[in-house]
Amino acid sequence: CDVMRVCTERCFSMSHFITRFADVVKIPEPTVAQVQLNELVSMCKRFMEGMCNDRNIILRLECDPEVGQVRLDASLFEQVLVNIIKNAAESIESAGEAAGKQGEITVRTTAPALIEIVDNGPGISKETEAKLFSPFFSTKPNGQGIGLVFIREVLSRHGCAFSLRTYNDGLTRFRILFN
């Protein structure tokens, strides 16, 4: 009977912990406004450049001048882009010098309204790809599995289509398409 009581208490305790943990990642409703997509992407690139330089990773920006304005919450979207670039940099860094190539991340915009973050890190297996946006799933030793969940929620609330996968050319692409 004590074993059942302990199990029940642990279940309630774990349930309470997960609920509290989930509250930490509550995402506010987007406050949308017309935003120049190229300006937002350029600002994020400048913000993340130092971190990439510190890791000996080249961060490139390729903006299509035909890309115009989109309706989005600039603050939430900045955090999405920062998280994606940070994840790409950490992936490249985890591969280390063994890869024998210069780490590169390219942030690209394409008309009418597409953002693509491309990296030459070690890539994502098909098995991992299927789990990427699941809560608490992480490929990092100390990862908590909430970064991509945050990204998924923000993009969904903005009505964006998105994908993250490694292609046959070995490059990993995070694509965000605005509707």
Predicted ranges, named:
Residues 1-179:
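Core catalytic ATP-binding domain of two-component histidine kinases
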